[in-house]
Swiss-Prot record:
TRAM domain ranges (all copies): 374-438
Alphabetical list of PANTHER family matching this protein: CDK5 REGULATORY SUBUNIT-ASSOCIATED PROTEIN 1, MITOCHONDRIAL TRNA METHYLTHIOTRANSFERASE CDK5RAP1
Residues noted as binding [4Fe-4S] cluster 2 in the record, renumbered to the chain: 155, 159, 162
Occurrences of domain Radical SAM core (ranges): 141-372
Gene: miaB
SMART domains: Elp3
Cofactor: binding details: Binds 2 [4Fe-4S] clusters. One cluster is coordinated with 3 cysteines and an exchangeable S-adenosyl-L-methionine.
The protein's name in its UniProt record: tRNA-2-methylthio-N(6)-dimethylallyladenosine synthase
This protein's UniProt keywords: 4Fe-4S, Cytoplasm, Iron, Iron-sulfur, Metal-binding, S-adenosyl-L-methionine, Transferase, tRNA processing
Length: 453
């Protein structure tokens, strides 16, 4: 008898990708094997995102197709996990009665138990707040080079636009020993890089007894043999301390790429967002990072068209982007999320105005990023090879320690997982091209090898 097959479809953030890898590992421990096509799978799992409306609507579009399959073949199992599942709960079953299991993010490690209930003939909704247990099942990781490692779940912030605290629950930090054990496991499996994940990762450890922090965790895991690079995301400006900055500058494996969302450049908008800092505090933070690590790569998130945002306030966002000089910036027009305070405010910005502001911001972002990239022309960068260039399989693709994508000639299969010196021969806003530096030729400077640039 053939083994049952599964297929996962993941929407949203890195946390969701890490959760999907863990759920895939659980399914394989139960005897499932991956399907090549979601239309052929015996079990289809949607790991959903509700941070913006368009992501949520994509979920329902996919669900409609799978519901038709299930009506023809009731043996198919349909699961919706993640933030849409947590937000909608029973309402999701009423909208798509073909579903077998609706489960929030806090239940990822309990998937096996929930599936047992489904196998017993039950339609299950699991969205009640629970503590997230440690799970010894190995995730089925998508990459063979870099591994996602969850270190803190949930969020205690109350930003007026954000649904995350409502759907992912309060902060729950993992024990340092459990995190190190997982990193040691991926190192033994041949991984060279880990990315530590959390909604607000720099809040790590304040809920533990005894309390600890992200700087201490980085020191604790830094000595794991085999791991060459350590990254972390996503950071909140309020918790990004000088101790953390100094620790990152000191530890050679910790990459000098920092993702720190600012969301808006106007203090008035930041106050309405309930972000807990000013644009001047954000500027000072980035300045301090660059004092310790002048070549640090800085990325962020920004929202345009927040309720009540004026043109003058939007101009402050443009000015901040220009002044900081971001290397990457994730931008979005404000999307009202049900259950958040900002969604109920009367001073919503018209859609056409939001679209116009987003286009103007994106143009500036591309200009600034292109100028930042151009500084690397002719430099030799250490690149961790991830695999083939998706658009040219004969080329290899990898990332610098500053998280810039680099394309270069080479055998992707042979080089995958290797750290290679690459001279940058062409720069673009969000990617680079280069050539491998052969033995005996110019090598990266010590600063480029010893720290993430």
């Amino acid at each position: 008898m053939a083994a049952p097959t599964y297929y996962t479809i993941t929407f949203g953030c890195q946390m969701n990708r890490a959760d999907s890898e863990r759920m895939a590992g659980i399914l394989e421990s139960l005897g499932y094997v991956p399907a090549e096509d979601e239309l052929q799978a015996d079990l289809v799992l949607f790991n959903t995102c509700t941070i913006r409306d368009n992501a949520e609507q994509k979920v329902y579009s996919y669900l409609g197709i799978q519901a038709q399959r299930k009506r023809k073949n009731p043996a198919i199992k349909l699961i919706v996990a993640g933030c849409v599942a947590q937000q909608e709960g029973e309402r999701l079953l009423r909208r798509v009665p073909e579903l077998d299991l609706v489960m929030g993010p806090q239940y990822v490690n309990r998937l096996g138990d929930l599936l047992a209930q489904v196998e017993a003939g039950n339609q299950v909704v699991a969205t009640e707040p629970v503590e997230i247990p440690e799970d010894i099942t190995k995730p089925r990781r998508d990459s063979r080079v870099t591994a996602w490692i969850n270190v803190i779940y949930g969020c205690n912030e109350r930003c007026t636009y954000c649904i995350v605290p409502l759907v992912r629950g309060r902060e729950q930090s993992r024990q340092p020993q459990a995190i190190r054990a997982e990193i040691e496991d991926v190192a033994r499996a041949g991984y060279r890089e880990v990315t530590l994940l959390g909604q607000n990762i720099d809040a790590y450890g304040r809920d533990l007894d005894p309390k600890t922090n992200l700087a201490s965790l980085l020191r604790f895991v830094h000595s794991v043999e085999g791991i060459e690079r350590i990254r972390f995301a996503t950071s909140h400006p309020r918790y990004f301390t000088e101790e953390l900055i100094a620790t990152c500058a000191e530890l050679p494996k910790v990459c000098e790429h920092f993702h720190i969302p600012f969301q808006a450049g106007s203090d008035a908008v930041l106050k309405r967002m309930r972000r807990g800092y000013t644009q001047e505090r954000y500027r000072q933070l980035i300045q301090l990072i660059r004092q310790y690590m002048p070549e640090a790569t800085i990325s962020a998130d920004a929202i345009v068209g927040f309720p009540g945002e004026t043109e003058a306030q939007f101009q402050e966002t443009l000015q901040l982007v220009q002044d900081i000089g971001f290397d990457f910036l994730n931008t979005a027009a404000y999307s009202p999320r049900p259950g958040t305070p900002a969604a109920e405010w009367p001073d919503q910005v018209p859609e056409e105005e939001k679209s116009d502001r987003l286009q103007r911001l994106n143009r500036l972002v591309a200009e600034v990023a292109a100028a930042r990239s151009a500084r690397l022309l002719g430099q030799v960068q250490e690149v961790l090879v991830e695999g083939p260039n998706p658009k040219n399989p004969r080329q290899a693709m990898g990332r610098t320690r500053g998280n810039r994508i680099v394309f270069f000639d080479g055998d992707p299969e042979q080089l995958q997982g290797s750290l290679v010196p690459v001279r940058i021969t062409a720069t673009r806003a969000f990617s680079l091209s280069g050539e491998i530096v052969k033995p005996g030729e110019e090598k990266p400077q010590a600063a480029e090898l010893g720290a993430c640039t």
